[in-house]
């Protein structure tokens, strides 16, 4: 059993230290609910894990959003709030992470992994970014993203009206 979210302070003995502000946390529980490990990731400001998926090799994928850059991402932080994806191995060690978004706010809310190791994220943005299949056309647009197993962006697309549209699950 895995859980993700955000925490304002450190607790217990994490694999990776709390950096400050709100950090994303990931915890592994056994079948009896006993925590096996937990780790933090993020920068000195607001980082929030919102979605979690596990692949056939027990790798853990987290989707969320960050207010500042951290670590050495595949794709750089672009500004304000950016969506992110993090891949951890089954022991909780970060394998890679990447940011997705533009100069305004972009929120990753949900994540899924297919049998070939491709990663899909749903979320929402209030500005365009990348080279989308369908252009951003409104105030807030739902988005979907496909990353390959190494975290490289394969495509992104926007959908919705000229008002507010929110992608929250995939």
Task: Name the predicted role of every residue range.
Residues 1-170:
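A sequence-level/structural motif corresponding to short, flexible coil/turn segments enriched
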């Amino acid at each position: 059993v895995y859980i993700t979210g955000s925490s304002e302070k450190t607790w217990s003995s994490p694999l990776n230290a709390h950096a400050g502000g709100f950090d994303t946390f990931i915890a592994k529980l056994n079948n009896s609910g006993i925590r096996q490990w937990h780790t933090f990731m993020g920068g000195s400001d607001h980082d929030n894990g919102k979605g979690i998926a596990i692949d056939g090799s027990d790798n853990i994928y987290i989707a969320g959003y960050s207010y500042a850059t951290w670590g050495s991402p595949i794709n750089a932080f672009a500004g304000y709030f950016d969506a992110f994806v993090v891949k951890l191995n089954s022991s909780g060690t970060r394998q890679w992470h990447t940011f997705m978004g533009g100069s305004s706010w972009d929120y990753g809310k949900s994540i899924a992994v297919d049998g070939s190791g491709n990663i899909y994220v749903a979320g929402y943005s209030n500005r365009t970014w990348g080279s989308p299949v369908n252009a951003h056309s409104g105030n807030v647009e739902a988005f979907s993203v496909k990353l390959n197993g190494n975290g490289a962006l394969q495509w992104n697309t926007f959908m919705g009206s000229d008002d507010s549209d929110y992608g929250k699950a995939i």
